[in-house]
């Protein structure tokens, strides 16, 4: 598989590697399963002296035995050599060999990658302390880079990065690997995918590399999704259930919370009413899911997140949003052998519910396009704040929203955008509403800011803005991939 993206992360690791020629370096790399940690580390370690070890959910003795084999193999020692007695001896040996590598190849420092560190640390509660001693006394004079990786984000943040961790303050870099954006993900999609297929794929699978890599180049969008998600033996059919069981102690309750969110219950009170738990208990589950990067709490643009009571929760990972919206309700049909009928009812033709779902995801894609354009210089705009606004329109006397609002405090600019994923669009009406709603996000601070108006559409527009007093920037979905 071709390596795609992650250039910023590679740059961080390469800088660490250069620094390790003069002093010890330590990186913490984490992110949930399937996100591409192994691919990133493998790409970074190409043509370098690297020991690559992955712990497993097994006893401490078994992990130590596996580590011993990997280390002995790297240093070309006989396979009959006995395992290390403990982790202290193992790390002491690596430190000694690192110094030997330094003498023989001073321009090629050693890299030690310890993947799935949480598994080993849970099997040996003193492992973090053992690494701390090794870093402070054995590795500190070694020209090497230590990379600790993990998929359990909660563990990595509390037990490795947290203030109470023995390893606190010893890292020289940390990377929380995020899903690809639309444009990075599209590079992994089938060659026969049209721009609309790419939008649909990203809306359904999101930016997790592993999910996208499962797509068959010879199959259509509908065929791929049916095979992966609506087939009882499909690779992604049970994916959310497996992640819940692996990461969480009470998967059934978390599953209920996600089901409630997928049906539109977006506050703790609504979720509480739906699943029968006290709202205070629901908040605990929401925070945990937020920590996993599966859900997020949104507040209207411009409000203080610490004091705002208008926050709404939603599933932010597109695949989980798709799975809980369309796959979970049809599990009964799928497990009775009616997977094709279940998939066809959703994927066949212009299914209204799916089109509405894509429209919701399209808003996030447009946000990503704006950020991407700002990053590559396509827009002279620095989004210091970015979000969505909703609330009361005092003139229209109704509740309304604005899909995207971004503020550039540095250059004193305010960007206001609407996203319309529709086959038939009244362009003049959309432009009129966009301009009218701009006043709803104005305040004493930004009232004199330059206003930038954008309208994102599914297809190119024919609207003639010559009579408009304000300039409108039109961006259609196809153009997003070529600009």
Language-model features: where?
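Conserved catalytic cores of phosphodiester-cleaving nucleases, focusing on short active-site segments
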Residues: 370, 400-423, 434, 453
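Accessory nucleic acid-recognition modules appended to NTPase machines
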Residues: 215-217, 222-402
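Conserved P-loop NTPase "ATPase switch" module shared by AAA+ and STAND
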Residues: 98-127, 131
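Conserved NTP-binding/hydrolysis module of P-loop NTPases
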Residues: 47-51, 57, 61-80, 93-96
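N-terminal pre-P-loop "Q-motif" helix
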Residues: 2-14
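Sensor-1/coupling segment of RecA-like P-loop NTPase cores
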Residues: 27-30, 119-123, 133-164
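Domain-level recognition of nuclease-like catalytic cores that cleave nucleotide substrates
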Residues: 447-483
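Interdomain motor-coupling "hinge/lid" segment immediately C-terminal to the ATP-binding subdomain
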Residues: 156-253
């Amino acid at each position: 598989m071709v390596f795609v993206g992650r250039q910023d992360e590679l740059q961080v690791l390469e800088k660490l590697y250069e620094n390790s020629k003069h002093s010890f370096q330590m990186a913490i790399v984490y992110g949930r399963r399937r996100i591409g940690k192994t691919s990133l580390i493998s790409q970074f370690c190409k043509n370098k002296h690297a020991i690559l070890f992955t712990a497993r959910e097994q006893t401490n003795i078994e992990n130590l035995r596996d580590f011993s084999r990997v280390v002995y193999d790297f240093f070309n020692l006989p396979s009959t050599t006995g395992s290390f007695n403990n982790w202290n001896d193992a790390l002491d040996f690596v430190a000694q060999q690192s110094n030997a590598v330094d003498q023989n190849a001073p321009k090629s420092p050693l890299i030690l990658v310890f993947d799935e560190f949480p598994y080993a640390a849970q099997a040996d509660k003193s492992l973090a302390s053992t690494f701390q001693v090794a870093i402070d006394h054995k590795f500190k004079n070694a020209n090497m880079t230590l990379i600790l990786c993990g998929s359990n984000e909660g563990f990595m943040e509390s037990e490795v990065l947290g203030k109470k961790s023995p390893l606190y303050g010893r890292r020289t870099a940390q990377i929380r690997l995020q899903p690809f954006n639309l444009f990075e993900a599209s590079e992994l999609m089938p060659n026969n995918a049209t721009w609309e297929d790419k939008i649909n794929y990203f809306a359904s699978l999101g930016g997790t590399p592993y999910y996208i890599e499962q797509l068959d180049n010879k199959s259509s969008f509908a065929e791929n999704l049916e095979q992966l998600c609506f087939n009882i033996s499909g690779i992604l059919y049970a994916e959310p259930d497996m992640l819940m069981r692996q990461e969480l102690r009470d998967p059934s309750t978390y599953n209920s919370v996600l089901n409630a969110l997928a049906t539109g219950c977006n506050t703790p009170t609504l979720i509480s009413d739906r699943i029968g738990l006290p709202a205070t208990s629901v908040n605990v589950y929401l925070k945990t899911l937020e920590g996993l990067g599966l859900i997020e709490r949104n507040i209207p643009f411009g409000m203080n997140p610490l004091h705002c009571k208008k926050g709404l929760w939603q599933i932010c990972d597109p695949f989980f949003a798709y799975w809980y919206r369309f796959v979970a309700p049809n599990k009964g049909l799928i497990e009775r052998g009616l997977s094709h009928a279940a998939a066809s009812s959703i994927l066949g033709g212009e299914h209204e519910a799916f089109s509405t779902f894509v429209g919701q995801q399209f808003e996030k894609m447009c946000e990503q396009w704006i950020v991407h354009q700002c990053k590559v210089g396509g827009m002279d705009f620095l989004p210091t704040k970015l979000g969505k606004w909703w609330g009361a329109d005092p003139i229209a006397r109704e509740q309304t929203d604005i899909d995207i609002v971004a503020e550039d405090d540095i250059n004193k600019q305010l960007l206001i955008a609407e996203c319309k994923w529709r086959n038939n669009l009244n362009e003049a009406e959309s432009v009129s509403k966009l301009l009218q709603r701009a006043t709803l996000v104005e305040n004493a601070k930004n009232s004199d800011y330059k206003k930038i108006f954008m309208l994102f559409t599914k297809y190119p527009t024919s609207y003639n803005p010559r009579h408009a007093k304000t300039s409108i920037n039109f961006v259609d979905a196809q153009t997003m991939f070529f600009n």
